[in-house]
Amino acid sequence: ITIRKAIEELVNEGYLYRVHGKGTYVKGEGEQNNLVSITSCTEDIEKLGHVPSRKVLNKNVIEADAKRKNVLNLGEEDEKIFSLSRIYYADDEPVNYTRTYLPYKYFPEIELFDFSRVSLYKILEEKYNVKITKATRTIEAISAHDELIDYLDVEENVPLLQFCCTTYGIVNGKEVPIEYFKCCYRTDKFKFYIYQAR
């Protein structure tokens, strides 16, 4: 048996996983991601050894309401935000629904990008030269309801993990809120861990 064939068999049996363009890795116990690093959903899916894909439900430049102005630290004159809704898939199975809001003044014409093909963070970093620095997250258990049942292909009242997050980055030399999102993960597909020390 060749080394290549042995690796192929271990991948097929679930002991190893491949990340395109990066290499082959040992799969840990369970499907889990850590909450310390700032990663995109695409990166989370890749880390678990799955092939990520995205479906854009809608993308619009809209008027910012009071809540979004507050969380994104926008002034009264900053009326426009970019709204983006997507479903993320792991090996063609829906695992996450995300609704994202960004201050349009920092990212003009961002609505022109095809977010079914490219990661939002990649666009922010490579096209708008943003350095993502930190994020604050709240985590809540919710029950699947309304459109989430269809988006994630789950039964009503199935538990989901909901994240509300504000992401910060350096824009024009200043650290500012660059993104607010709310997302829901299927709990049968994702686990998260937090490393703590004392």
Regions found by a protein language model. Give the residues of each.
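N-terminal helix-turn-helix
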Residues: 1-26
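Short, cationic-aromatic polyanion-contact patches
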Residues: 25-38
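C-terminal all-alpha effector/ligand-binding and dimerization domain
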Residues: 51-198
